Amino acid sequence: MSNYLKTRYSEDKRPHTSYPAELVNYLFQRFNLKPSMKLLEPGVGRGEFLREFKKLGLEVVGLDISPEAKDLSPDLHIVIEDSDSIKLPFDDNSFDVIYSKSFIEHLHNPSFFLNEAYRIIKPQGLLITLTPDWEVQYKKFYDDYTHITPFTSVSLEEIQKACGFKDVKVFKFRQLPLLWKYPFLNLLSILISPFVPLRTTNKYLRWSWELMLVSSGVVPKKK
């Protein structure tokens, strides 16, 4: 895994764009998040999403297995730990929100992580997870050699319920901000998607057919 983050998130491969700010603002409104909430992002990468949550007034902490994450985000509080198999270095009921994007599919043991997430989220706190939709992306899911555990909408819902989360909801999601404002345009994406090359490098064409799963789960009052 040496240099994985610096290679995966190089400016050549993934130049900085306005997308993190657009997605974070969408999620902030969609899930009724509030400034001053304490948020943890596992799989923080280069910190671009976490940084946007911080701009909105949340108290943020990042978590990553790679020490490179600290080098990529010296302005953020980043904790280095293997969240796949080791108890997370946080007290019970520490966070209002745990948010992750393109993280849970990298885990050998997602149930272990979700049980830990349940432990450290406060009662009535929220888990927000974004992960590729296996039913749509199975042909190229393993193009990223670090992908391990795929999810469907059913399995993503069931694993969270099994780990104690309540009011679990999962919906399919295209990563095109225009579609969030004008959902009727999803029909156009559906119509053109069969004609988009599987491994197109044009992100707008790619995102017209790639679907993500977005899930949310609430931690109930604990005994």
Predicted feature residues:
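Short N-terminal helix/helix-N-cap motif within the alpha/beta-hydrolase-1
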Residues: L107-F112, K139
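A C-terminal cap/extension of S-adenosyl-L-methionine-dependent methyltransferases
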Residues: I128, E158, K169-K223
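Short, glycine-/aromatic-enriched active-site segment of Class I SAM-dependent methyltransferases
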Residues: I128-T149
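A short His-aromatic
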Residues: S102-H106
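Short alpha-helix
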Residues: I148-C163
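Conserved N-terminal segment of class I S-adenosyl-L-methionine
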Residues: M1-D91, V97-K101, S111-L114, F173, ...
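A short glycine-rich, Lys/Arg-flanked "PGG" loop and its adjoining helix->strand segment in the class I
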Residues: S111-P123
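A short hydrophobic/small-residue beta-strand
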Residues: V60, L127-I128
